[in-house]
Curated annotation (Swiss-Prot):
Organism, as annotated: Cupiennius salei
Main location: secreted
Name this protein carries in UniProt: Ctenidin-3
Biological classification of the source: Eukaryota, Metazoa, Ecdysozoa, Arthropoda, Chelicerata
Compartment list: Secreted
Keyword tags: Amidation, Antibiotic, Antimicrobial, Immunity, Innate immunity, Secreted, Signal
Length: 142
């Protein structure tokens, strides 16, 4: 069992590197804040983002130690389109899913260190390390 821990950590780091190269993801949406109008959450070493990014959201990327994802959603044509966008997917250690839909998009994924619920306000979902109350909303990156 002790031999598996380094392998898991190494695999998580690799996932984080690939996620950082994803569609608008990586550290731009990572850390404590969620992502703008439907962007991805972060996570400790994780990569977020979303295919749609910005307006309309899209799906968030996963991966990394303490991962967990922010969701989509956002504003389309100046309206609060609840239900559009959608959740992301987890990956690595402490995965989880982000919520989507509408202005401020649903809830962030739990799991990882300091997980819990993100989302709220204009931000996307939180999750992973430093998630929870810091995921999106007031602390979300615009």
């Amino acid at each position: 069992m002790k031999h598996l821990i380094p392998l898991i950590v190494m695999a998580s780091v690799v996932l984080a590197v690939y996620a950082d190269r994803g569609y608008g993801g990586g550290r731009r949406g990572g850390g404590y804040g969620g992502g703008g109008y439907g962007g991805g959450g972060g996570g400790y070493g994780g990569g977020g983002g979303g295919y749609g990014g910005g307006v309309g959201g899209g799906r968030g990327g996963g991966g990394g130690l303490g991962g967990g994802r922010g969701g989509g959603g956002g504003v389309i044509d100046g309206k609060d389109d609840v239900g559009l966008g959608g959740g992301g997917y987890g990956g690595g250690l402490g995965g989880g899913q982000g919520g989507g839909g509408g202005l401020g998009g649903g809830q962030g994924g739990g799991g990882g260190l300091g997980g819990g619920r993100g989302g709220g306000g204009y931000g996307g979902g939180g999750g992973g390390y430093g998630g929870g109350k810091y995921g999106g909303g007031k602390y979300g990156r615009k």
